[in-house]
């Protein structure tokens, strides 16, 4: 008994000595502290905001394009990552938002209003697609959404009187905004959408409902959740994010052709979401930047023949060493 008492006293004294040393030690970076994460977040935003002052026009264009793509990736994170609905037709919604802004702006409508119409039309199409698609599962759902993407591409290609088809829409008026302003606008929009998705995922009851539907629809239905309505809302909101991506793309590039919104682009968005980590908005944001800037940077350096090879190699390496994607790595650092 005396030995046990003495060991407890020794342990207590050692713990007190350690605490005294820590109190006298200089400030240490706490990786798991909320304050440290806030500092890192503020620093990252400040670095992104300062990029136009550091890099040239080409790289700023690449970052803006990557930010626009990230909105389409966010739409997949909401639909597939949170709700568990596999979609290979997101490029169709992006094209709807883009061409709505392009056509209306060419007719003299204000670009902001035309972009809003593009988002609303994409949401309407997402709602209509969700009516039958919300009842499908697995590969049936994947094929159904892929069919929607192909149908949208064919409509954009063959509606020559409206979209000019393969000739493309040229000279879309956007008010003459300079690149630095575009960059800051895109960065602000992406951060707002990213913050909204992170809030839904981690803090809101809607995120809990979406995850319940993803994990077990029968249990969610037994809990009183209208699974069909939840899926329909997910389709609609996801289409709105994709439509916003398309509207901003049209306003920035000012040139549209249907080939920019074919099924290959849908697979590209899905690949970015997978590399970023399905269901991780932060990972999707990082993957969209990574998988846009590095291949395009190789093209700028004259290594265009190896661009797709490097792209595929990057994807395989990430999936091999990070099965949960970049988002999984971020989550491990948080814990």
Q: Where are the regions that the model predicts?
A:
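Transmembrane alpha-helices and adjacent helix-loop boundaries
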Residues: 35-335
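Aromatic (phenylalanine/tyrosine) cluster motif
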Residues: 5, 27-29
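Residue-identity detector for glycine
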Residues: 12, 33-35
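A charge-rich, low-complexity, intrinsically flexible signal that marks solvent-exposed coils, linkers
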Residues: 18-21
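N-terminal regulatory/sensing modules of transcriptional regulators
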Residues: 23-25
């Amino acid at each position: 008994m005396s030995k046990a008492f003495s060991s407890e006293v020794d342990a207590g004294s050692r713990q007190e000595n350690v605490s005294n040393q820590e109190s006298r030690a200089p400030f240490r970076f706490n990786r798991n502290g909320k304050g440290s994460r806030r500092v890192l977040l503020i620093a990252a935003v400040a670095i992104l905001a300062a990029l136009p002052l550091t890099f040239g026009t080409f790289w700023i264009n690449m970052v803006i394009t990557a930010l626009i793509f990230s909105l389409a990736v966010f739409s997949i994170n909401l639909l597939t990552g949170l709700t568990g609905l596999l979609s290979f037709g997101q490029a169709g919604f992006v094209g709807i938002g883009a061409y709505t802004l392009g056509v209306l702006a060419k007719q003299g409508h204000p670009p902001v209003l035309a972009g809003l119409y593009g988002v609303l039309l994409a949401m309407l199409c997402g709602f209509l697609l969700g009516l039958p698609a919300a009842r499908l599962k697995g590969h049936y759902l994947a094929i159904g959404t892929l069919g929607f993407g192909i149908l949208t591409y064919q409509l954009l290609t063959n509606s020559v009187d409206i979209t000019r088809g393969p000739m493309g829409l040229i000279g879309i008026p956007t008010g003459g905004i300079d690149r630095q302003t575009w960059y800051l606008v895109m960065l602000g929009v992406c951060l707002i959408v990213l913050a909204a998705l992170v809030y839904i995922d981690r803090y809101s009851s809607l995120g809990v409902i979406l995850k319940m539907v993803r994990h077990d629809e029968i249990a969610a239905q037994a809990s009183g959740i209208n699974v069909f309505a939840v899926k329909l809302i997910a389709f609609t909101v996801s289409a709105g994010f994709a439509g916003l991506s398309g509207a901003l793309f049209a306003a920035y590039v000012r040139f549209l052709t249907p080939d920019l919104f074919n099924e290959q682009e849908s697979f590209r968005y899905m690949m970015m979401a997978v590399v970023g980590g399905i269901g991780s908005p932060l990972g999707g944001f990082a993957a969209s930047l990574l998988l846009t800037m590095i291949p395009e940077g190789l093209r700028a350096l004259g290594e265009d023949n190896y661009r797709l090879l490097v792209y595929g190699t990057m994807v395989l390496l990430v999936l091999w060493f990070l099965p949960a994607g970049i988002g999984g790595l971020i989550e491990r650092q948080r814990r």
